[in-house]
């Protein structure tokens, strides 16, 4: 039976997306995956803009010369700002919560970013992914197909771990003092442990126990008033822990400790920064396959260079909303993008659909899938969409780039951002506007700092102060906007079947569907390009639609190379329809809107029984499980089920009604 498409005619709101993403360089060659047929299109999807430890400096225009003194000053400024901003996060979160609903009144809708078609013809219904992040759980799927779970908190024993008697020679008080010394939690520079039964064997065991259990500490024996003491200390002060390569490391271990990170309501980079601070190491010794967003419970694999499992396990005593486990030692780190995808468990509360509607919707999702649109978080949550900034970059309209980022905007923001924008509009003085920002690591602060350093006539270099992945986010957003719009046009014109002139991939090579082989393909094989200098376009009406859309934005589809190499994008290919794997669902009845409707990994570790549901209840919820390849958006799958607008602007209205 031929599938038909359904246009979006109803406005509502549902969910905040928590899809995982993997930042990559857009200019890399196309790579094939089921979701997006390149590793270069994932961009930076999280709402927050994060500093990278390894970010290169600004792209240089022809007239720009590297300035080592400025670079050193920048590092010093950033270190001072990190200390300055430590106490600001909680207050900022409170203010953000108060202004969120107002801010969303000025946000985007799906229609604004080209999202307007559906696959299934079933009747839509409403449902809410509540503000509770626990209704959205993401488990990473490795290349081997294994779904990451936190189900083991034990520490592996290797050949060079201390013998059992070494673990008993230190009292609980000794261990606490040594741990505080190791993590610089007290002002002491050493810890002295008296040797009660003074024998060489006993002293040796204590030395071994301290060095094994507390890497980074050195020991020596001292005589004090006729008594023997083992004294533990940092060999090189605070720098000792900053370079784990200098620590003693058992030869039997791989250099990397792999572990499962379970986190609640915290994005991956924030979690790694927390671990780094506790361990007193740089964030860049951690590696991972993809980042997971904040508003969810997520489980993923992390690797860290030469930090012992025992030391990581100790952190479970003091971490909030984070838990580490499933430790193992491996020879290699993890690589970005080296994952098969993610498994989602999603609860949609207070659904209005009948059991028959739910059945039709979920069967369609399992059998046909959903349109592989870029989700709403790709385009930002404020009155200035990220794709508008990206378009200005591609147009070389640098004054417009500066204005779009810094100008006052409708909708509520954090108070200090409002004051900063007002100061900028009034004075056009970057130094003066920068003083209004207590948090200077935001994109506005980074741009203002660049303008202060390079001047108003060198906006290119000033913009280059912003970390590279965050700069590329803007142009990826524009590409995504074009792709969404063109896919909607393609489905409007030709429906959900392959036609001659469509593109498919043979391996990594794009090829056209011809008249005589159209029956050899399905809609799931069809790809469409993101605009760039190294892609081809369909051989039908949609090719001209691409050209017209870019021309309307003063861009030449035949000349997508930019004068600045970073902004020259090769393009990529992306499947237009995705069929989720491992799809299952159930409708449950409940009375209390606050109760959890399934167990998390931590619940299972703690032995909590799974929730029991009554046959009838005040409300009904749809619990969905499904797996998606990388670079696909779970909200777009949920949108297909509900037939509703997933923009936060619409979601805010529905959630407000639900909470009354």
UniProtKB/Swiss-Prot annotation:
Function: Pseudouridylate synthase that catalyzes pseudouridylation of RNAs. Acts as a regulator of protein synthesis in embryonic stem cells by mediating pseudouridylation of RNA fragments derived from tRNAs (tRFs): pseudouridylated tRFs inhibit translation by targeting the translation initiation complex. Also catalyzes pseudouridylation of mRNAs: mediates pseudouridylation of mRNAs with the consensus sequence 5'-UGUAG-3'. Acts as a regulator of pre-mRNA splicing by mediating pseudouridylation of pre-mRNAs at locations associated with alternatively spliced regions.
Taxonomic lineage of the native organism: Eukaryota, Metazoa, Chordata, Craniata, Vertebrata
Protein name per UniProt: Pseudouridylate synthase 7 homolog
GO molecular function: enzyme binding; pseudouridine synthase activity; RNA binding; tRNA pseudouridine(13) synthase activity
Biased composition, class Basic and acidic residues, residue ranges: 22-32
Active site feature: 293
Enzyme type, top EC level: isomerase
Listed SUPFAM superfamilies: Pseudouridine synthase
Location(s) in or outside the cell: Nucleus
Assigned protein family: Belongs to the pseudouridine synthase TruD family.
Originating species: Mus musculus (Mouse)
Catalysis performed (reactions): a uridine in tRNA = a pseudouridine in tRNA; uridine(13) in tRNA = pseudouridine(13) in tRNA; a uridine in mRNA = a pseudouridine in mRNA
The EC number(s) this enzyme carries: 5.4.99.-
PROSITE patterns: TRUD, UPF0024
């Amino acid at each position: 039976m031929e599938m038909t498409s359904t246009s979006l005619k109803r406005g509502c709101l549902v969910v905040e997306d928590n899809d995982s993403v993997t930042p990559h360089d857009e200019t890399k060659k196309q790579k094939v995956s089921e979701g997006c047929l390149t590793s270069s299109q994932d961009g930076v999807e999280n709402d927050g803009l994060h500093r990278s430890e390894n970010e290169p400096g600004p792209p240089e225009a022809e007239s720009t010369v590297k300035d080592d003194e400025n670079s050193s000053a920048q590092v010093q400024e950033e270190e001072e700002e990190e200390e300055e901003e430590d106490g600001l996060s909680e207050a900022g979160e409170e203010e953000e919560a108060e202004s969120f609903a107002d801010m969303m009144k000025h946000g985007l809708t799906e229609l604004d970013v080209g999202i307007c078609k559906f696959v299934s013809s079933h009747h839509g219904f409403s449902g809410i992914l509540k503000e509770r992040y626990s209704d959205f759980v993401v488990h990473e799927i490795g290349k081997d197909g294994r779904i990451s779970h936190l189900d083991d908190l034990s520490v592996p024993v290797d050949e060079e771990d201390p013998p059992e008697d070494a673990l008993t020679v230190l009292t609980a008080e000794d261990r606490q003092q040594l741990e505080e010394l190791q993590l610089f939690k007290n002002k002491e520079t050493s810890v002295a442990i008296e040797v009660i039964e003074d024998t060489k064997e006993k002293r040796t065991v204590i030395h071994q126990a301290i060095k094994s259990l507390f890497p980074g500490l050195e020991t020596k024996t001292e005589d004090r008033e006729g008594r023997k003491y083992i004294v533990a200390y940092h060999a090189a002060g605070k720098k000792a822990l900053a370079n784990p390569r200098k620590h003693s490391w058992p030869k039997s271990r791989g250099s990397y400790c792999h572990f499962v990170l379970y986190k609640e309501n915290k994005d991956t980079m924030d979690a790694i920064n927390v671990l780094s601070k506790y361990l007193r190491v740089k964030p860049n010794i951690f590696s991972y396959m993809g980042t997971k967003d904040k508003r969810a419970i997520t489980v993923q694999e992390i690797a860290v260079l030469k930090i012992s499992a025992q030391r990581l396990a100790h952190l479970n005593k003091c971490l909030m909303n984070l838990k580490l486990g499933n430790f193992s030692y491996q020879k290699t780190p993890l690589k970005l993008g080296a994952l098969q995808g993610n498994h989602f468990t999603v609860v949609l509360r207070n659904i209005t659909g009948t059991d028959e509607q739910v059945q039709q919707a979920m069967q369609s999702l399992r059998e046909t899938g959903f349109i592989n649109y870029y989700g709403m978080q790709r385009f930002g949550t404020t009155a200035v969409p990220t794709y508008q900034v990206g378009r200005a970059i591609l147009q070389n309209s640098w004054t417009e780039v500066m204005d779009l980022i810094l100008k006052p905007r409708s909708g509520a923001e954090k108070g200090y951002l409002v004051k900063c924008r007002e100061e900028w509009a009034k004075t056009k003085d970057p130094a003066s506007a920068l003083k209004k920002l207590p948090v200077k690591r935001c994109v506005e602060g980074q741009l203002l700092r660049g303008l202060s350093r390079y001047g108003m006539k060198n906006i290119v270099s000033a913009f280059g102060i912003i970390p590279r992945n965050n700069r590329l986010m803007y142009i990826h957003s524009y590409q995504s906007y074009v792709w969404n719009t063109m896919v909607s046009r393609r489905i409007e014109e030709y429906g959900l079947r392959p036609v001659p002139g469509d593109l498919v991939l043979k391996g990594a090579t794009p090829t056209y569907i011809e008249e005589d082989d159209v029956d050899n393909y399905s809609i799931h094989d069809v790809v469409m390009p993101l605009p760039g200098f190294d892609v081809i376009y369909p051989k039908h009406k949609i090719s001209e639609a691409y050209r017209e859309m870019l021309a309307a934005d003063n861009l030449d589809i035949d000349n997508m190379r930019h004068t600045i190499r970073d902004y020259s994008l090769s393009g990529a290919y992306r499947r237009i329809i995705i069929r989720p794997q491992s799809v299952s669902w159930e409708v449950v009845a409940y009375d209390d809107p606050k109760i959890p409707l399934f167990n998390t990994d931590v619940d299972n570790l703690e032995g909590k029984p799974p929730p029991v549901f009554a046959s009838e209840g005040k409300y009904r919820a749809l619990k969905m499980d499904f797996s998606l390849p990388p670079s696909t958006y779970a909200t777009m799958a949920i949108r297909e089920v509900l037939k509703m607008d997933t923009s936060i602007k619409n979601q805010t209205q529905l959630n407000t009604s639900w909470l009354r």
